[in-house]
Amino acid sequence: MNFNNELSDLKNRFLFRTLRAQKCSDVARDRIDFFIWELKFLNCFLHLQSFAFASECGMLDISQKMIEICKRFNTPPPHNSFAYWKEVICKRLCAISIQPDASSDDGFACWKKVIWKTKQEFRAKYSFPKTLLADNKVYDDDDTNPKFVMEFIDAVVGNLNVLVKINDPSSLLFVPGPKEQIEQVLKELKLLRFFVCFVSNKCIEPQYQHTTFYTHALIEASHIAMVVWLNLPIYGNRNQDLASSEVSCLLSDFMEMKIKSIQPDISRNNIYIDVLRALKSTIPQAQDKHAAESGIVETPTHNLMVGLSDQMANLQEMLCLLRDNLIHLPILDLEFHLQDMDSVIVDAGLLIYSLYDIKGQKEDTTLEDINQALGFDLPRNIEPIKAMINLVMQKAFQCNLPRIHGLGYVDFLLKNLKDFQGRYSDSLDFLKNQLQVIQTEFESLQPFLKVVVEEPHNKLKTLNEDCATQIIRKAYEVEYVVDACINKEVPQWCIERWLLDIIEEITCIKAKIQEKNTVEDTMKTVIARTSSKLARTPRMNEEIVGFEDVIENLRKKLLNGTKGQDVISIHGMPGLGKTTLANSLYSDRSVFSQFDICAQCCVSQVYSYKDLILALLRDAIGEGSVRRELHANELADMLRKTLLPRRYLILVDDVWENSVWDDLRGCFPDVNNRSRIILTTRHHEVAKYASVHSDPLHLRMFDEVESWKLLEKKVFGEESCSPLLKNVGLRIAKMCGQLPLSIVLVAGILSEMEKEVECWEQVANNLGSYIHNDSRAIVDKSYHVLPCHLKSCFLYFGAFLEDRVIDISRLIRLWISEAFIKSSEGRRLEDIAEGYLENLIGRNLVMVTQRSISDGKAKECRLHDVLLDFCKERAAEENFLLWINRDQITKPSSCVYSHKQHAHLAFTEMHNLVEWSASCSFVGSVVLSNKYDSYFSTRDISSLHDFSISRILPNFKFLKVLDLEHRVFIDFIPTELVYLKYFSAHIEQNSIPSSISNLWNLETLILKSPIYALRCTLLLPSTVWDMVKLRHLYIPDFSTRIEAALLENSAKLYNLETLSTLYFSRVEDAELMLRKTPNLRKLICEVECLEYPPQYHVLNFPIRLEILKLYRSKFKTIPFCISAPNLKYLKLCGFSLDSQYLSETADHLKHLEVLILYKVEFGDHREWKVSNGKFPQLKILKLEYLSLVKWIVADDAFPNLEQLVLRGCQDLMEIPSCFMDILSLKYIGVEYCNESVVKSALNIQETQVEDYQNTNFKLVLIEFSLQKKAWKLNLTDAEDMHNAVKNILAEIR
């Protein structure tokens, strides 16, 4: 109805006018809504006045009555009284808009009374008609076309919806009492509308063939409209209950189909049956439209014979399943079944409407009686409906599956199948045989999946990956069907059919594999190259290649030039290497040694001002001195004061807008000491805006020589390319369009291939000329050649924010929880995942930003912006991952009806998660990232609480990963999400519910507290020890306790590897806990004891323990000596130790590589003696804020030490001279120590560099007091060191 749009515009104009005059009251708004409601119904009736059938419906009688009432009010009678009332109401709307104040009644009460009395007189002459059209009365009217009928029904439904939604008793549109009957009428009208739509869409003959049906539908809708308009709302009736009962009676006539035909043999059902039979005869030629009009199958089952109650209940359940799944199914998934679908829908309609016409129904009517009366076999007629429902349900589920999968999903399923059958034996008993067959089939396919991972370059790679994808998709289906069975969401007959289909499809997949002999060949052949691709650990060569002239020019600007502050701006397109070039200059020893302070930050498109300041402060003054709880402006002032007296070098990377520079420039004071700022950006305008003295540098493209040099370096490292490959290599380098990022990505492809001319020629041919200046094409090619087990891992980077460093331990835990990692006998999943990551690093798809000094493993990484954008876009295309950003993504409703439910969702806003929750039933993971401040203060925290999440999480029933670590504070743990494997969040409560054991799949549990909160105790329930799959229990901000009496009778957690932070008040408790966790690898705990119990003088930690952190709670003495044969990392905090204790500890820790002593006291003598041979494998020694005065170290101690860090050791006399002779030493850092420590550090460097020619040695001195002068020195160059040592030693002396 076009008039509805006119009314909407009219209403908006009135509201705008009243708001301009003065604030529109709620009463005025309600009056406007009331008149709009009346106008919409009147408009509907106006459209019906000219119908030839109107006289039979009583319409004209009512119109005549309205004319009489007009005369009574001395108003000239209009030709059409409905039009008259429409005009009157429009005038009243104008009156309200002029005087919107509720106190200015302006005769409204009088008009309301007139309208109500008018309706009363109408009702006195009007009764709900008991007749339908006779068979021989068919009216050929243009307005009975299906489009008009559907619009008319939509208008009536819209007005009824208004009444249902209003719950305010003071509203003029409020309907008292239960509204179930109105809602049921709404359902009936929607059904009728679906029916009209279905007939219209499927009809291939002229529409007038079904005029009887369309006219009947219009009559029913018009009478419902008349009943509602005349009787509701009941604002003018004192006896509202009586009016409500009268309306209920009238609506019941419609509901119970008491509209009888003039001719006894014609009924509403006859009309429906006739039109369905006509459609059935033309189905083969019907239009191929979406079958979503299957809403017609939502037929009510009231008023049916008692004998059909059970059969009809089953039928109704089937039809609901069909409808619910059809509306979420794309037409492409049914393109070969549309005719069958139409046939089933029509048959269902025929079946139901036939059942209404059976005469003489009795209480004891049997199924045989019904079949005889209907003339067909009811159960047999239902079978095609079952078959179609089964097909549609499977298609509806399959269309939501991602096209990229983790090959570890079968491992997860096989474990769960066993657990499910044990936990839910009653629910799954009837499926026992099918589940055993499925389990056996999946187990038989495990060797094949192993081959897919270990032989990614197999000649049958495409076939293998296609089969692997099909296998994983079947695993998803089995999981869904089993869950649906347990929760009784799908009927038993459907589940049985579905599992049988799955078994048949798995058999077909196996036959396909066996046909190509892939399984037999790989099982019988000794694989020479097994998992070499997983085990290798390539290192990224950080040495920059090319741009020699640019680097030299920029180096001069940094070291020479103006005495004032200068900004060196570098701009250019993505992928040119701006960040790599800037980092190369920033870390150039000839550059940074000339500056007192060096600091850097990365901005990116979405940034946090506070985060930027914090990053700069951490570099400028050290992590320990940064006060994160301060406001951003206070931190900025701290940074400015820190830089003020120094010569500084600042790197500001990836600036997108001028406003960023406006925010930061005030932090960088100019005191004419040649301080420099390097700024990179994609935009020339930003570079020009930030420039001070030097002109912005537009970074050029590579030339052909540089392109080949970079390609050769990335593929061959320090080796040279063979002459046979050089020609094709030069051609490939040229194809990369002189873009460094493209060259690096192509090098990643070549490095994975055999060094043969044929292979390289194939790459050159596949790349083609189209890749010039198109880095996306290169990324796509790099992605295409990835083995399938790495594709999911790579795309998962799309869940992270741009320009953010990614913690690799967290990334690997997420990969494992997402089932991306395929298990391999005898290997830890973490080790396999590290191999996957190193493979991606070796392909130049992932950049390492930090590696562990002790073992060289990557600790942090990031992606180039171009690669990250690719991951987000491709992941969305593959139904794999969708990044939900408030500024970029439309409302979830659009996604619901495009039928894409992605496997993984990444959010930046809590409200986005709430909005999308109802649309994400199949989602497997939710990651909520924080794009603003990384650190929260008490001023920020109130906006971060969102306990509404507890109400929406049950919608994510298949959730396996829920990572809320970076944004949300919750007051609950979602114990109903039984599939959950990874859960991370901030909490404020001091206990964990015992129901946490419901999360029997949970492998990683990370709970943190607000940074502003004081450290408190968190009680662990004994049921935690029932969670046998738990691998990482990380609760760092609490003192976690569990009663020893409860622990004694609990099970062992054999899979637990990480435990933090547990509190022990007795050594006995610690010993008991260690027995219950025999495979721990990382333990962080607090201890509180007074003395050594003799029986616990040596506490034996688990043999696999590698990381141990011990914190003092109250008493300073450690009540045990540590014995951990494979311990590599030890941190002791707050204890009082002596040389004997540390000597005994060293004897038990032969493999220790990292030792950190923090705020440790050394007794009355404040002395530490380290004897010969102690700490033989130690690589890193950090001493922080110790009370140590005298440190004596034997010549043969610390023989493999590489790093020595002293921080805040103000009383230490000196660093022992034996460190001069440790040839493995590479680094000494001295922060906030006295002058004697600095002097000894300088002497050590002088000996290391000059005497032993240790060119890798590096000394960093930060913030020590020397004649009231603050210093930060970063010395590595021999000449710089020589001059600095001479000058500083001279001052010290």
UniProtKB/Swiss-Prot annotation:
Residues 423-446, 538-560 form a coiled coil. The gene is R1A. SUPFAM superfamilies: L domain-like (SSF52058), P-loop containing nucleoside triphosphate hydrolases (SSF52540). It is a peripheral membrane protein. This is Late blight resistance protein R1-A. Keywords: ATP-binding, Coiled coil, Cytoplasm, Hypersensitive response, Leucine-rich repeat, Membrane, Nucleotide-binding, Plant defense, Repeat. Confers resistance to late blight (Phytophthora infestans) races carrying the avirulence gene Avr1. Resistance proteins guard the plant against pathogens that contain an appropriate avirulence protein via an indirect interaction with this avirulence protein. That triggers a defense system including the hypersensitive response, which restricts the pathogen growth. LRR repeats lie at residues 876-899, 956-981, 1027-1049, 1056-1079, 1102-1125, 1149-1172, 1175-1197, 1198-1222, 1235-1259. It comes from Solanum demissum (Wild potato). GO terms for molecular function: ADP binding; ATP binding. Belongs to the disease resistance NB-LRR family. Pfam families: NB-ARC, NB-LRR, WH_DRP. This protein is encoded by the haplotype A genome of the allohexaploid Solanum demissum. One of its GO terms (biological process) is plant-type hypersensitive response.
